[in-house]
Amino acid sequence: MDGDRDAPNLPGGETNSVARGAAGDGLGAGDVAVSTDRMHPDVGRRHRSWKWVPVACVVVLLIAGGWYRTDYVGMFPGSAAGLDHLVEVNGQTPAEEPGEGDIHFLTVTVGSRMNFYEYLLAKLDDDVEIVDESVFTGGGTRDAARQRNFAAMDASEQQAAATALDYLGAPSIGASVLVVIGGTPAENNLHVNDLITAVNGVAVASSSDAVKQVQQSVPGDEIELAVDRDGEAQVITITAADNGEGRALIGVQLVTRYEEQVGIKIDGVGGPSAGMAMTLEFIDALTPGDMTNGLEIAVTGEILPDGTAGPVGGVPQKAIAARRADVDLMLVPEANLDDALTTAGDLKVVAITDVQSALDAIGEAGGNIQGLKGSLAD
């Protein structure tokens, strides 16, 4: 009898060959192909799964790029802030008249350390300067750098007040301690804001008077200081150190204090770069009329003890802030002029060297500067 007829008749020609194999007949090449495909259905799927490996790698790299922080931060344009409503004279804010102009100080914003994508975007933005974070931190923490900047702002305010009052010829009352230098004889003896009124029994009315008297001594001498500390009179004796050149050193930076008291309430801003702006605002606030004559004037630059304008950082970003604020004039230290011109556009920028050159620039732009110098002298 024919074996083919003994096999059950299954539907479909392909499965007939499998049935024959099960009954003991030899399998042909076609039979093997059919039965192998049905016994291992995941072979093709395993092959296709390898296609996802490159995609997974890309996803991992994208996540890593967003997570990884570089050593760089972005310096962005900040603001141009008017000082009129922030200044105080003898504890009072001077009244503003309609139409008065203003002196604006300029800021920059420093971001946190950038990730890879932020870094790439900053590279494409002409308004942003990329710098190593250590430029701001000095290798320390951001919090420590922030505290140093706030201290620098306070010192700058006092120097600006002294410079303005000196320019106006106001009567002075002594030498105020601006900075106490660590590791010097003054460190454990004098405090910031101590008012020195006499040195070795000689009355002093200014910082220069005090320095001259100290320099009459030699290293190793005892120097007697008459000090007003928070309204309490004290006599403090300090043994002078050597400044490295054979001259007496006590270890303080001094600033002249005046009968008139001026200050500015600025919160959350650090660094010394508003010094020249504060100096000009103090001069305006202490004298009659509107020095700006309705002009909006942006100013940047450190104010140094001799009244000169010290260079500052971030000037391209500050020029952008001034331009966006639509001010009439921007004053910058001479050393920063080229930096300002790179981003100032149509804004008029004038280089200054000291207080007088800044006032001259304001006068040439239409301000009222006549009769200011020495106007508070007795």
Region spans (language model):
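Short, well-ordered loop/turn sites that connect or cap secondary structure elements
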Residues: 18, 27, 190-191, 217
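Hydrophobic membrane-insertion alpha-helices, especially the h-region
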Residues: 51-69
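PDZ/PDZ-like peptide-tail recognition elements
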Residues: 75-111, 130-181, 237-301
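Glycine- and Gly-Pro-enriched alpha-helical subdomains that act as flexible
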Residues: 285, 305-332
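Terminal targeting segments of Actinobacterial cell-envelope proteins
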Residues: 1-49, 129-133
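PDZ/PDZ-like domain segments forming the peptide/carboxylate-binding groove
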Residues: 154-198, 202-205, 308-313, 325
